[in-house]
Design a protein with these regions (language model features):
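Catalytic beta-strand-to-alpha-helix segment of the class III nucleotidyl cyclase homology domain
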Residues: 53-203
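Generic surface-pattern signal
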Residues: 27-31, 71, 75-86, 251, ...
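Low-complexity, intrinsically disordered regions enriched in charged/polar residues
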Residues: 12, 19, 23, 104, ...
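Catalytic NTP-binding/metal-coordinating core of nucleotidyl cyclase/transferase enzymes
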Residues: 1-76
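Intrinsically disordered, glycine/charged-rich C-terminal tails and inter-domain linkers
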Residues: 129-146, 154-286
Length: 286
């Protein structure tokens, strides 16, 4: 939720609306993605996660579901924003969302200081009972709390800076994965049935330097929106005054998602990203 500081300053009943926002987003996302879980709450942000291995019973259903995650997030984001405006009519309050992906490994022992070369991110499990916090159990009653740490986690927070209302911003790796899934699976001669091609809904709207990401090389900012041809639906009348990216979009200075192939190639990252995509598909098969 964006703009909540001003809202809290002038609205005495803000705790009710913030709590309602938490509840609405979580319950609606869980309705769309049953396996989703709360990672943590950060102020007016809700961080949630899902393992791609939990998305279905077979490769076809998991792959189809994965490709539709941006659509599902967009749906919930739009519904939450609509409810806020119906209840409060405060244009300065906006709902924004970011989706990214990372390969992680669980750290069972802190004696081994080296990570698996395929994973630069970890699941750090905190024993809540050892910390004297047994009352703060997770939603499934477990006594441990998981946190996700690593450079790919940081990328998600950096990319979130470019989130925009009525759009979903995706990390480049996640966008590339969604673009590649149909081709990769067909290459393996698997009968892949999907009636939805996400490429038309993803656009590279800008290239930005993100602190600590890609050695300060320009990073592609990807937005999801289901109807790029309808300019009247894309933005509010004054959005171009608030965000320079809007001008780029309206003037057509955007790139199709398959441009990512060239980006990774020119940065020498093709081998790395293809290995990641193959690893993700292996997880989808399990």
């Amino acid at each position: 939720m964006v703009g909540s500081t001003k809202f809290k300053a002038k609205e005495e009943t803000w705790p009710f609306y913030i709590s309602q926002f938490y509840y609405t987003v979580y319950t609606e996302l869980q309705r769309e993605i049953q396996q989703i879980k709360v990672w943590k709450y950060l102020g007016d942000e809700i961080l949630l996660y899902v393992s791609i291995q939990d998305l279905g019973l077979d490769l076809d259903s998991r792959s189809s579901f994965l490709i539709k995650i941006p659509e599902k997030v967009y749906k919930v984001q739009s519904e939450a924003a609509k409810k806020i405006q119906e209840d409060l009519f405060m244009p300065e309050l906006e709902v924004k969302s970011t989706v990214w992906i990372a390969g992680v490994q669980t750290i069972w022992s802190y004696e081994n200081k080296k990570l698996d070369k395929n994973y630069q991110n970890i699941i750090a499990t905190i024993d809540m009972e050892a910390k004297g916090e047994t009352e703060n159990k997770t939603e499934n009653g477990a006594k441990d709390r998981d946190d996700f740490l690593g450079p790919d986690m940081d990328i998600g927070f950096r990319v979130a800076k470019f989130a925009f209302h009525h759009k979903v911003v995706l990390s480049a790796d996640f966008a590339y994965l969604l673009h590649e899934i149909p081709t990769k699976i067909k290459d393996e001669e698997i009968d892949y049935k999907i009636d939805y091609k996400i490429d038309d809904d993803l656009q590279i709207v800008s290239y930005e330097i993100l602190k600590g990401v890609w050695n300060e090389q320009y990073y592609p900012i990807v937005w999801y929106f289901p109807d790029w041809k309808s300019k009247d639906l894309l933005f509010f009348y004054d959005d171009h005054k608030k965000n320079p990216i809007v001008d780029r979009v309206l003037s057509g200075r955007i790139d199709p998602i398959d441009k990512l192939t060239q980006v990774y190639k020119e940065l020498g990252k093709t081998k790395e990203i293809d290995a990641f995509v193959n690893e993700c598909i292996s997880c989808l098969k399990q």
